[in-house]
A protein has these predicted regions:
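Adenosine-phosphate binding glycine-rich loop
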Residues: 43-153
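A structured beta-alpha segment of the ubiquitous adenosine-cofactor-binding alpha/beta core
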Residues: 1-41
């Protein structure tokens, strides 16, 4: 890139930025702005799956619209949780002075992400709710269990 932009790239079709989210695609990865999927454009989303890489890219009203349309959403708190998980691994390693190799970190990350996804998917199926609400249900249940184990409640 010599122009600093993709605009005018030879052989590419230029698309209005407001229509990018409405392109027909299997998976949509909103990765930049909060509230970019909202009640004004959610009904025009053509993706079958949305994996939220940005923080809060979908508004609550859009969540409901997408759920009613049958669009599968992997909410931001699940899709972008890898960094937080690995930060936790770093804290655990530092506190115990026992350090893992890259393979061990990746294996642990895979286990945590897979378990989280299964938990959210199960909550979604059992309660017939949208995925963000399912993720919140799982999260609140885990915090409640941790508080109970610690004798706080």
């Amino acid at each position: 890139l010599t122009t600093g932009s993709l605009a005018g790239f030879r052989g590419a079709e230029e698309i209005d930025r407001d229509r990018v989210l409405e392109i027909e695609t299997d998976i949509l990865y909103p990765a930049a702005l909060e509230n970019s999927i909202n009640d004004k454009n959610a009904d025009r989303i053509k993706a079958g799956i949305i994996s939220e890489l940005a923080n809060g890219p979908t508004t609550p009203n859009a969540d409901l619209i997408l759920f009613e349309k049958g669009v599968k959403v992997i909410p931001d708190i699940l899709a972008s949780s890898g960094g937080v998980i690995v930060s936790y691994f770093e804290m655990v390693q530092d506190s115990s002075s026992f350090f893992w190799d890259e393979e061990g970190v990746n294996r642990g990350l895979d286990l945590k992400i897979s378990k989280g996804f299964r938990s959210v998917f199960n909550a979604l199926e059992e309660n017939r709710i949208h995925s963000r609400l399912a993720a919140m249900v799982v999260g609140v249940a885990r915090v409640a269990e941790a508080c109970k184990i610690r004798g706080w409640v």
